[in-house]
Amino acid sequence: MTRRRDFGALRRLPSGRWQARFRLPTGERVTAPRTFPTKADAARWLSAAEVDRARGLWIDPRAGAVRLEEYAWAWLDSRVRLAPRTREIYESQLANHILPLVDNGLPPLGEVRLGDITSELVRAWYAALERSRSVSTAAKAYTRLRQILGQAVADDRLAKNPCRIDGGGTERHPEQRFANLQELYALAGAVPKRYRALVLTAGLAGLRQGELFALRRRDVDLLRATITVRRKRLRLASGEVIEDDPKSAAGRRVVALPRQLVAELDRHLSEYVLLGSDSYMFTSSTDSPLERSNFRMRVWYPATEAAGLEGLRFHDLRHTAGTLAARTGATTKELMARLGHASPRAAMVYQHAAEDRDRLIADRLDLMAEESGLAAVVPLSGRTRKASGDTHQR
């Protein structure tokens, strides 16, 4: 039985459930993507569709009928400017954390239609991912899902993004570890001599490992005491080795070197680097470009154990360089430029790590006051106190 209305129509099906539908100006009929247990429920859907159409917010329910798995892979294929390593990371997030089953009480998200992904489902998926994987993994996967569904909104497949977890994409990293100067030089002394300059360059200049592995002789200018970062070198999970631009445009930079590092690099160039401007700065004992995994197992792990710094990552030397730079009084912008950060957020970490400079700042303020001839206030502990029986005069 069909019920006539000013907008659309309601129909009771033989099953007893209710169906809502209406016609577009083109004459095409649109049916609600689901049936409703009561006439009132169906009427509410129809009324909402009428209001959304009047406001220009209506989304054809059929547009959201595509499964997330199909839409997500198509979205990734459309990202033609992604760096190869970034594409690998996105593929892994989709295949391992976003699309498959993460909890027996939930459907695999990849099998759910876009229009059926609700905020409640996203929250349950996120919580299950935190439990079964880790907080950091859940945050990364959530950020990617939000990005994909944001594109679905832009494509008029969804009216709004169901990813609305406050702080859901915020990663909570453990306290960053770094080596002090004594530990840095202990590490440099623990590695074979051909890697000494590599360790010190990481810990004093703050280059990323891929940037260090890509350095050539022509990138090091001892006269000007600088290193020019032009590229990074890494091996993909597929086994392919790529050399391309640094992580971001800010990664292309010129880094000033302290004198002690210039001396180390001068010695390294004469002893370990082949002639020719395009020769790699840091190589294996066979003069081959360094491989991350081989270096970690054969050089780094034994050195950290010998120096009593087990658990320290090579990337932590970059934290060391950032922290040491912050302790010199470098501003956020200066740290960004030196370390190749595109945003202030990462650079601020090193300023927080250098909070012990706050006492030095206070001491220097005292010195400024003294140099200006301003008398310091005598602290209460330095004053002569009256005996407890003395009468206090008002």
Regions found by a protein language model. Name each.
Residues 18-23, 42, 227-229, 257:
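Short beta-strand motif preference
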Residues 1, 189, 224, 233-261, ...:
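C-terminal secondary-structure termini that scaffold catalytic or DNA-interacting sites
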Residues 48-57, 69-134, 148-151, 308:
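Basic/aromatic-enriched alpha-helical hairpins
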Residues 135-143, 154-215, 223, 234-235, ...:
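Basic, Lys/Arg- and aromatic-enriched nucleic-acid-binding interface segment
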Residues 37-53:
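A short, charged, amphipathic alpha-helix used as a generic interaction element across diverse proteins
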Residues 1-37, 85:
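Short, Arg/Lys-rich segments that mark the N-terminal edge of DNA/RNA- and chromatin-recognition modules
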Residues 219-226, 311, 330-349, 374, ...:
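Short, polar N-cap/turn motifs at the start of nucleic acid-interacting alpha helices
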Residues 104, 186-196, 205, 255, ...:
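Short, basic (Lys/Arg/His-rich) helix/loop patches that form interaction surfaces
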